[in-house]
Amino acid sequence: VDVLYGPWPRHHRDVTLAEVRRRLEHSPVGGALALSTRGPLFDDRAGNEETLRDLAGCPELRPVGTVDVRDAMTAEDRLDELAAAGVRFLRLFTAEQAAEPGFPGYRRVVELALARGMVLLHDGDPRRYGPPLMGRGADVVFLDLHAYLLADFLLMAREEPGFRVTTRMLSGPDSVERVVHSVGARHLVFGSRTPFMDISPSTLRLRYADISDDERHAVATGNVEELLS
């Protein structure tokens, strides 16, 4: 759920869409949610248009949209454009755009996105961004939850059926199992942050986790398919 292509700060070079597709092709991952980094880094409208245009010929990739939370006055137009294009997922880049959970622009973007039934792909610390999203019926996938912070997420997930976390940073020996056995497999989705991280550790952790085959399938594909429906 967290595939990017294009330039990225602190990364040694641009990674083209073609290269990302090659990496996925040579991995166990058969499909992904992706977007161009032009949207969060330079121009949200142009970036969304680029993502839709580029991914139109990539059947294994589903487009993700974004908006610039620093310019929430234009967010409504951007979200309407994404909805018209059938985009279900909105990725927020609060770190790159210096957006705190209490900022007016952030609150406005979230309000507009939830009103349109969009799924938030959310960066940052869930301990900070999760509580303001509780009690709102939100579908949120937290992308940056570290294994050390898992207990706080589990407490929120007990109350929020729409809160999910990716496997990417759940590096503890039983992190995947803790999520599945504590709150259910529906709260976990596969994530690797291709191409900026090696995809192998995430796939191996999921493959050998002590969970049932049905739970493994839900984490790998089923939960995202449900969000797409």
Place the predicted regions along the sequence by residue.
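A general structural detector for well-ordered alpha-helical segments in enzyme core domains, enriched
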Residues: 19-23, 47-54, 78-82, 105-109, ...
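Mid-to-C-terminal alpha-helical segments outside catalytic/metal-binding sites
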Residues: 1-3, 13-31, 200-229
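Active-site neighborhood of phospho(di)ester-bond hydrolases with catalytic His/Asp-centered motifs
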Residues: 1, 33-36, 64-66, 91, ...
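Divalent metal-dependent hydrolysis catalytic cores, especially in the metallo-beta-lactamase
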Residues: 3-4, 19-42, 60-66, 87-95, ...
